[in-house]
Amino acid sequence: SASAMDFKMTISRNLKHYNPDLKTIVPEHFYFFDRTSTTAANKWTIILDIDQSGSMGESVIYSSIISCILASMASIKTRIVAFDTNIVDLTEKSDDPVDLLFGFQLGGGTDINKSIAYCEQFIENPAKTLFFLISDLDEGGNRAGLLRRISDMKESGVTVISLLAIADGGKPYYDAQTAQKLAGLGVPCFACTPQLLPTLLEKALKGQDLSKFEKMK
């Protein structure tokens, strides 16, 4: 089951294989140590809804790495969706980190509401679904619709996390008003460093407190 995964070891071993000089990922074997059998009933679904507008470049790189690592884990169903004003489902590219990275096309506007609507079809068991919205929340589409969909997701039992950025340092740009409204719905909103992603995933899947991450905003 997902709770049997050693997320810190598995993810940390692979995050380092992005080579900034080559501007590509040089992966090693993916590691997964599962101590229990997995059935459809106890399998988690993790949905990564990734903003590929121009301001999200560094976050896209780290999102692609984490997506491939998660997709390699048999105890998790992973869906990878990229969006600007259009939507691209990159799930089928997740077995090749380089192929996945080049599936992203940076630039364009942002329609977060549209992407969330697309992702809703992948929620089969809300209590076993973790939805990451990786975006600076600079919505160019229907902001009220975005908030309504997130609220409905939360009420159904989905664990929703808004990652404003995945970056090594610095204060990220994000739409503070939308972030505040999401926080009012009980959605944690924060930026995260790549090094803390393993801990974040572990705590989120175990339903643990994420308040220390929110202080990083």
Show which residues each predicted segment covers.
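Negatively charged sequence features
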Residues: 1-44
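MIDAS-like acidic motif and immediate structural context at the N-terminus
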Residues: 11, 34-63, 67
